[in-house]
Amino acid sequence: MRRRPRRRRILPYLLGALALVLALSFGVRALRYRLAHENLPGSGIAAPDFVTVDYLPANEYSRPGTPLEEISGVVIHYVGNPGTSAAANRSFFANLALTHETYASAHFLVGLDGEILQCVPLTEIAYCSNTATDYTVSIEVCHGDETGEFSETTMESLEALVAWLCETFSLDPAEDVIRHYDVTGKVCPKYYVENEDAWLSFKQDVSARIEEDKTANGEAS
């Protein structure tokens, strides 16, 4: 009968040891992640104020944690679900960890009201651009109807985001900003595939914004 208290005294030690093991395991994983991502092009770069950072949980289907070792382009997509919000599309990506439906994500989502969500760090790949996944930043853009055309509010935010990425990673909008279509031939983003002039105009607008930013910052063009 007197042995039971001893067992009760041992239990806290066992629980403490288990907690220590778990803490050490978490610390080792965190250290491995930091070492794998600390010298990448996107490391140490904070999102601009107009971007809301809301990372997906780490998982095999939408945020595998694979290092993005090169950033030499930006790929524009459209979500393909008319009327859906940036938050709804982020939820779809996050839920893939449970549904295992497909592999999909994007670094950024631009919404119908111009909101921008960052879903994946710039030190990691996003499952979005097929063979270009390993060296590009991907942007999914929401649209109001089947035409795939983006609203003026959405466009304003998209231009600002792409200009910031080009400035940050020394990219040329004319050459380094591409459509999903340019990678695989998929009709994405639909409006810009079916309206080439609008696509070229968008890239020119991004270039113009970059020049405006340089002028505002007192930099030579």
Show which residues each predicted segment covers:
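Cell-envelope and extracellular/periplasmic
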Residues: G80, A132, V137-E146
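Basic/polar, cationic surfaces and motifs that engage anionic cell-wall
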Residues: R2, P12, G16, R29-T52, ...
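Soluble periplasmic/extracytoplasmic beta-strand elements of cell-envelope proteins
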Residues: V75, L109, S138-E140, I178
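Glycine/serine-rich loop-strand microenvironments at binding/catalytic pocket rims
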Residues: I116-V137, K203-K214
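N-terminal catalytic cores of peptidoglycan-degrading enzymes
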Residues: M1-S129, S221
